[in-house]
């Protein structure tokens, strides 16, 4: 089953595979696809919920004759299934129960209020909810997303999944264990008053009664489930809130900016929305008249602990990466702006020559592409351009006032995407983004003051409330959207195919516990490889719980400088050792600077140490199972600042201009802090650390 799911086999492919097996090894596997699915099929059920074909009002899940309470249209479940007037609902409770019983360390964290914010649990809103007493020690909370995904190029059909993550899981575990409670399929966007209803109804029950589950000691727990955060883009967000879209009057989800056109700066500053006012506006609104941008009540208002203002976040994938960053690039390079002083399209060929030579580490999956191809760039590519490439590349190309303006934006994002964000730094970023948005109008004109530029003024509030931007971004949800698109073949029964395959994946680990218990190591290794998307970890051996090395090391002698560096660290003289050019420390893959396979398009050896030094990794030296170290060559920091804003008293501390040095050092693996991007631009070398070790493309 793991092979079938990993390689996304069609029913025909599976049938052929079963036939081949049965010809060579009769009776070892089921004979038909029906028997195969019966033996290894999905765990859990799903059911269709119907809506009126005329007005899309919710009709429920009962079979037989159905009558709409609004328009009195009469239909039945069979005809609704044929016409596609339904959506699929999966039990969120059973998915979370399975997750809780698998991840039993879920409640071991003790999040305390401190000077830094390192995840959602450190945010003010989460802490406030925890301190209210509504949330017990065994209770959990959710961050969820709803967005549309087009299925076919030749039609308008799309799916709208609701995805949920458990906040109390570690960030990587959180993103790897997404729950899918509802799936909409159709030619147009879902009618949210209908689509959200089963989701809200189940959440209301889970908030009140909780989920019963047993730990490894067979002790029963009851965990209530609270819906705290919705992270969706600016198109889906007003549908969920039942408000006007951003291009309408009072279309901002967080303040009372008039909108309806360019989001220019207003005096006085528009007042922030509140929960009480939103409820009043929703109740006062009618079909003919909206109130301050609110069209009416949303089903989400039935959830006792979900906030209609602070519960939504201005997530940065669409606002920052696909929003303001893309907008700036189009302003700079679009030929329609050739008469503007910010236009640099005539220099795009020169910039491309440098841009395509940049060699990011493996965490940045996509290598830089030509500026001419920017309409094909993904959100992760725009993120890389903003964080790592733009400032060094455009230095001396953009007029200084535009380049200094860009620095404010880059500075802010480096801090807000940090693994740990200092609360005092958020205040600095808030001033930086305020200046950025005010200058944006002066530099690029009022006509270019888009909603995304306006949304930047609300991002710092989101970080205070719910943690760093990476913690509430839609990147993981969008990635899972791509996974769902692989779960169907052909054009018939698409939602059913997607849901069945999703449930098969969910049940795979449960069934594997029994089936794989007595399997030999070779079979377990194959199974692990089929489950993992990180194939590099399958061919490695463990030195200790934090360090893994890859096969085929080099045996050799240390040079005199290398031997001296090792003696300085370990206190012993060593002449021979084993050299590893690929290794993993705390889940992060490193290469040596001489690793041949990666050197063409990647520089995966530039690191920052815990003491602040910048280095290139030469090799991992292993003397015994318990004695090893990393050999590095230091990069000399020139101390020159790339950029500075004297008014705000901020500098580009996240960019270091460096020179090569001959200083070789040996350091313990625990001293490796984070990977860096090494940029060569304008005949200078710059090192820019990755803001955090959690996000991956």
Per-segment meaning from a language model:
Residues 17, 147, 199, 227-231, ...:
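Short, conserved catalytic/metal-binding motifs centered on acidic residues
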Residues 46-49, 65, 249:
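Residues immediately within or flanking Cys/His clusters that coordinate Zn2+
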Residues 64, 155-159, 176-177, 194-197, ...:
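Short coil/turn segments at secondary-structure boundaries
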Residues 51-61:
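Short Cys/His-rich zinc-binding micro-motifs
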Residues 1-49:
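N-terminal alpha-helical interaction blocks
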Residues 162-214, 251-253, 257-310, 617-618, ...:
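E2/UBC-UEV (E2-variant) core
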Residues 70-148, 157, 176, 205-392, ...:
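Charged (Asp/Glu and Lys/Arg) segments that form or flank catalytic channels of large polymer-
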Residues 256, 341-697:
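Terminal interaction-prone segments of large eukaryotic proteins
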